[in-house]
Amino acid sequence: MKKILLSIFFSVTLLSAVFAQESWQKVKIYSNDLKSDIAMLRKVGVTIDEGFTGKDNSISVFLPASDVEKLRSTGIRFDVVISDWDAYYKSLPVLSPEEQLAVRQQSKQTYGVEGLTYGTMGGFYTLAEIYAQLDSMRARFPNLITQKVAIGTTLENRPIYAVKISDNPDATENEPRALYTALIHAREPAGMMTVIYYMYYLLENYNTDNAVKYLVDNREIWFIPCINPDGYEYNRSTNPNGGGLWRKNRSLNSGAYGVDLNRNFGPYSYWNSPNGGSSTVASDIDYRGPSEFSERETQAIKNFAVGKNFKTALNYHTFSNLLIYPYGCWTYLPPDSATFIEYASDMVAMNGYSPGTSWQLLYPVRGSSDDYMYDGDPEGTGKVFAMTPEVGGDSDDFWPPQSRIFPLAIENLRPNLYYTWVAGDYVSLASYQLNKQYISPGDQVQMNLTMKNKGLSNAENITVTLESLSGLMTVSNGTVNVPLVTSRGTYTTTSPLTFTIAFNAPIDTLVKARIVTSKNGVMMSADTLGFITGVPTFVFKDTTDNPLLNWTVTATPSTPKWEATTTDFHSGPTSFTDSKSGNYANNATVTMATTNPISLVGYSNPKLSFWTKWSTESDYDCGVLMISTNNGSTWTALAGSLTKPASGLGKQTPAGMPVYEGVSSNWKQEQISLSAYANQSIKLKFELRSDVGLVADGWYVDDIGIMVYSAVPVELVSFTGNISGGMVNLDWSTATELNNRGFEVQRSLNGSEWFTAGFIECAGTKTSSTNYHFSEQVAGTGTIQYRLKQIDFDGTYKFHGPVNIESDVVLSYDLMQNYPNPFNPETVIRFNTASDGNVSINVYDILGNKVSTLVNGFMKAGGHQVSFKPEGLTSGIYFYEMVTPGFSKKLKMLYLK
């Protein structure tokens, strides 16, 4: 399971006369039964809150030095990792002024942010410096941010300040509202620096970034950078250079200082939930207070939020690289869990955090700000999609080194922007449909889109544009307007986008494009698409609904194991998953390997393709796809477009091995080239690996196949002919076509000489059936043969036919127009004779001079044709004349040299 932050502090009752903080140690406690040992520690006065669980059945926690001796008395094995936290923190590297300047310059160059500086408390801002930053923002950007507004006052008479960023900051507008808070726990300043960095990003990029301008103009974005001023100032008084570990506020209860503000929110049923997610002992660090909203700070947040109708909120904490959503107080998901999961999945894809509820990822929590904001006061605050980012990894602790301040803020920049977007309208591509199953060179393709408004407000007047990212693709109709997409709804376009693949596009080539969604010229989202040219032929394809038919399944422990499920799939009715009912097991290895070898002999560039989704513990659990060329004796992990390098922790070993890990909640197609294994016999294996700790839903795969992409031949499925009303009618059809320039229709009256009767142009490449028709006057009596010369754009050709037409038509004398006309270098002249006799056909120039004799002699009755290929003649108009006893006719033709 995910690195779980559990900080175990032994409860030390702080009498009112005691103000000094003890030194702290970081210890690593080893446990064979985590739940049992935690229960035992609670009995001796241990409070469980924030810390870090290792993958060797250990918990790394901070303890007061005096409590380390108490730990020894329990008999639980432990190691001291940091013997003196204060000394350790003071020994952390400090950035020089030159190094600080370089970091800030890089921030300005890459993200346009230069306002964030380093504070004087270990690089973090003190409370006074936070207030000064808010004043500076107002002075620099008076038209974008309000003056700081006191929304409440603490017990020690310190104001709790909020500010709003918007295009009319001093006015209240009917715009979607988003909220960002930090420092509800006094020892977590990295969240505050992350929030202030985002504020500067909005302010300093307003005039240069259209998306930022749109958000500021169309949202009211509120910030409370420090909810707990008294606790934060107390840390400054004890540790002026940073590193203070005081967590709560400074109210006095039963002789002990402090209430955990993130356990003090209502309503009563949430605050007093039976899950034990807070302490009732005043000296404990997660003490919930004497009643819900007993503290001035939580009262201030409640009063501030009432009537604001916030749509989204991020309440920043540290640390553990998590994104936590409701419920914490109940061990079931909220009614809007699908929305929370979608938002969280999108956001963690940007920074690699792990999403889930507190009881899924950490421990039960009751009285939290997220639960209250979501549905704790529907009449007052409405429904706020509130979540908690836990910023920073294990080595960052509560006070990260100076070198980590900017990176932590930057890794949350895109999630912050996303959550401001979805407070209002935010439309992106949900899916697309093509009018062709496969795409080949020369294809003209139509695309219809299904767009989803992930936002919490209706989206109107949206523009969707198809952009080519390849020189092999030309967009002909690339824009569609979407009039309205309701909040959380979808819209399917009715007017298709169209594009053409170049005739010279190589087979088996990835052609990329992207769908850009915008409003008023401002890009909301961009989704990249890829199409592989050619038609796949499957070397191996699993079309079964039972993995045991093609795969050998093993599992340690014996269950759960790979099975078919009907509850989630890419193409129905099933997909394969490692844990059909619920989560995968701890310390599990679950494999699915092809039973029989797959031959790739004769294929130069085979591709493995499958659809997949997964949810595993980041950095520790994973899915691994492997290949073997020796019948399974040894296996090699395959890297794909969706894999990540293994962390080297837990079951993600060795480090750097390609794995599927973290969360990818939507079905995605994975395609992996197997060209390195061409002309060999292979086996494939899907393997889910987990260590001891967090468990999750696991790995899903569907539509597994190995394919080769090839050209589509011109496949003629029929070719027929008949005579009707003195006309020859030819009909033929194709099943598929590739690079087909057209069909030249050829005729023969004697079975040996072939003449062109006409030409039918084609459209290049088609993967669906096409019908063709050609007709002409009957050219003679007896057997007339026709054939088709199919010509590609590269000049190559292939003959189809012939078909025989039996003609008993009685012909009259006639001379027909030459074909082709104009012509160069040769043309064909057809003529009919009604009876046996002498015939002459001569060619004359425009002055009447005879330049060629084509026919001069006895001809049988019937249809005839003769070719004319000028030699030594100039371009121009020529006449040809047929003369027989009792018949003559002259026609004109054009020779273009």
Question: Where would I find each of the regions flagged by the language model?
Answer:
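Exoplasmic/lumenal beta-rich domain surfaces
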Residues: 629-676, 751-773
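Glycine-centered coil/turn sites that cap beta-strands in beta-rich domains
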Residues: 600-609, 614, 715-742, 801-844, ...
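Short, compositionally biased serine/threonine- and acidic-rich segments at solvent-exposed termini, linkers
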Residues: 703-811
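Metallocarboxypeptidase
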Residues: 26-28, 236-434, 475
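Extracellular glycan-recognition surfaces and repeat-rich motifs
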Residues: 539-589, 639-668, 837
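Terminal connector regions
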Residues: 497-536
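Short, surface-exposed loop/turn motifs with a glycine/proline- and acidic-biased composition
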Residues: 761-786, 855-885, 890
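Intrinsically disordered, low-complexity Pro/Gly/Ser/Thr-rich segments with frequent PxxP/GP/PP motifs
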Residues: 474-505
